From Swiss-Prot:
Its main location: nucleus. GO terms for biological process: heterochromatin formation. This is Histone H2A.z. The keyword DNA-binding applies. Core component of nucleosome which plays a central role in DNA double strand break (DSB) repair. Nucleosomes wrap and compact DNA into chromatin, limiting DNA accessibility to the cellular machineries which require DNA as a template. Histones thereby play a central role in transcription regulation, DNA repair, DNA replication and chromosomal stability. DNA accessibility is regulated via a complex set of post-translational modifications of histones, also called histone code, and nucleosome remodeling. SMART domains: H2A (SM00414). Belongs to the histone H2A family. It comes from Dictyostelium discoideum (Social amoeba). CDD domains: HFD_H2A.
């Protein structure tokens, strides 16, 4: 064999690199999160395990929010037929209905186009008052 044939065989035997996300069994990009963490940490020394852990947490939170949002869309599609898109309104309602996510996101986040949570204060609701005096009963009946 010539030298060029042996080097070409060595190149063909080279194993393709496997992404860190695949090794960890995640969808979120571990390598990108690792790079971003290294840019933010002053000493530039970050363990790859911390990146895997952070990617797993972010993936879990994203899946939780998406699951709750899909349930909001299905609830609204029963009221209004053929709702097939997730809107900022659905996202807001999903986050506000879950107590833990609401506590996590409440302080620093505003969802553009989300609107407000439907709520009517008890004072503003119409309540029939019972008349206390007999004269009030007569005036109400006469009207």
């Amino acid at each position: 064999m010539t030298e060029s044939e042996t080097t070409s065989k060595k190149v063909n035997k080279r194993v393709k690199p496997v992404p860190k996300s695949t090794k960890a069994g995640l969808i979120f990009p571990v390598g990108r999160i690792h790079r971003m963490l290294k840019n933010k940490v002053p000493l530039k020394r970050v363990s790859i395990l911390s990146s895997v852990y952070l990617a797993a947490i972010l993936e879990y939170l994203a899946s939780e929010v998406l699951e709750l949002t899909i349930s909001q869309v299905s609830i609204q599609s029963k009221e209004y037929h053929n709702v097939r898109r997730i809107s900022p309104r659905h996202l807001l309602l999903a986050i506000k209905t879950d107590e833990e996510l609401d506590n996590l996101i409440r302080v620093s986040t505003t969802i553009a186009g989300g609107g407000v949570i439907p709520y009517i204060h008890e004072v503003l609701k119409k309540v029939e008052q019972k008349p206390t005096h007999p004269q009030q009963k007569q005036t109400i009946k006469s009207i």
